[in-house]
């Protein structure tokens, strides 16, 4: 007991002496506690896409430069997409937005502060979106940012309760903030999302995608997956008229050509999670789950896969 008392006394004296001396060196102050940008450095994240551009056509499905102004209207929703000098951004360029939105949503889930302005590593973006990492990949990435910045969208779709009445760029701004000393290729990028997309993100107006989405080569296949994922819900199948599917896809192909492309996509069976069956008699497409257990339950409850009950949509 005496030894313990002495030790406590010594500790007390040391603490009192420390108060009269210069304070010990600690961590340097946080000089930027409220940064005006978000660093996209999260390693594990789920693929997230805003549900509005999944339902309605905002992007070109062709890799060829597309300079047409797009006008879309459905059930009171209007979208006008005007290309910039380099043409409309393609659905492949949308991968940049999916990556950014996914990072932001995961940060929100972790309670981290977020911002419309995002800093990211070009290499991480290329790897995460299943792209190459050669010099040409970086050139294409720069071109993608330019088209996203150049395109102007006008829409009455509200995001997080707000309507943006004037036209807006898909991204407000982008710049290279660091280059590789060895290759001169861009290493770090800063971009600012439109308020419209940022509001959709912080409002959690997003859906989770299968990570194999980035492995889809065809623009129409990517678009078909988006549409199916948006309208799917938890039903094992979803049926839609070809006219409506053609409209929602944003495809510039004729309706006849679109049917051919749809049947080709059905034959390729590349879509994650879903299969497609075309019914030429009703001129409808049926998307049904690749989950055999869910499909078996649907067949048991309805008696046949071919019935439209419970899964037809004219949304």
Regions found by a protein language model. Name each.
Residues 1-315:
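Charged, alpha-helix-forming regions
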């Amino acid at each position: 007991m005496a030894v313990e008392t002495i030790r406590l006394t010594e500790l007390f004296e040391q603490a009192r002496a420390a108060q009269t001396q210069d304070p010990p060196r600690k961590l340097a102050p946080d000089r930027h506690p409220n940064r005006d940008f978000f660093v996209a450095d999260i390693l594990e994240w789920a693929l997230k896409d805003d549900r509005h551009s999944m339902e309605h056509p905002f992007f070109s499905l062709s890799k060829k430069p597309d300079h047409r102004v797009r006008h879309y209207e459905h059930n009171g929703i209007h979208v006008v997409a005007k290309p910039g000098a380099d043409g409309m951004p393609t659905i492949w360029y949308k991968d940049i937005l999916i990556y950014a939105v996914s990072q932001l949503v995961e940060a929100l889930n972790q309670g981290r502060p977020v911002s419309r302005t995002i800093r990211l590593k070009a290499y991480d973006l290329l790897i995460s979106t299943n792209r190459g990492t050669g010099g040409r990949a970086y050139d294409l990435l720069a071109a993608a940012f330019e088209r996203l910045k150049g395109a102007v969208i006008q829409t009455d779709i509200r995001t997080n309760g707000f309507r943006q009445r004037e036209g807006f760029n898909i991204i407000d701004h982008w710049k290279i903030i660091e280059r590789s000393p060895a290759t001169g290729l861009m290493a770090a990028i800063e971009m600012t999302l439109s308020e419209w997309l940022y509001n959709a993100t912080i409002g959690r107006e997003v859906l989770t995608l299968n990570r194999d989405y980035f492995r889809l080569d065809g623009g129409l296949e990517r678009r078909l997956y988006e549409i199916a994922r948006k309208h799917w819900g938890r039903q094992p199948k979803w049926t839609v008229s070809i006219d409506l599917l053609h409209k929602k896809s944003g495809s510039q192909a004729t309706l006849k050509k679109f049917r051919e492309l749809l049947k080709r996509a059905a034959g390729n069976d590349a879509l994650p999670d879903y299969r497609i069956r075309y019914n030429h008699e009703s001129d409808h497409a049926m998307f049904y789950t690749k989950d055999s257990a869910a499909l078996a339950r649907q067949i048991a409850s309805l008696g046949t896969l071919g019935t439209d009950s419970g899964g037809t949509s004219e949304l």
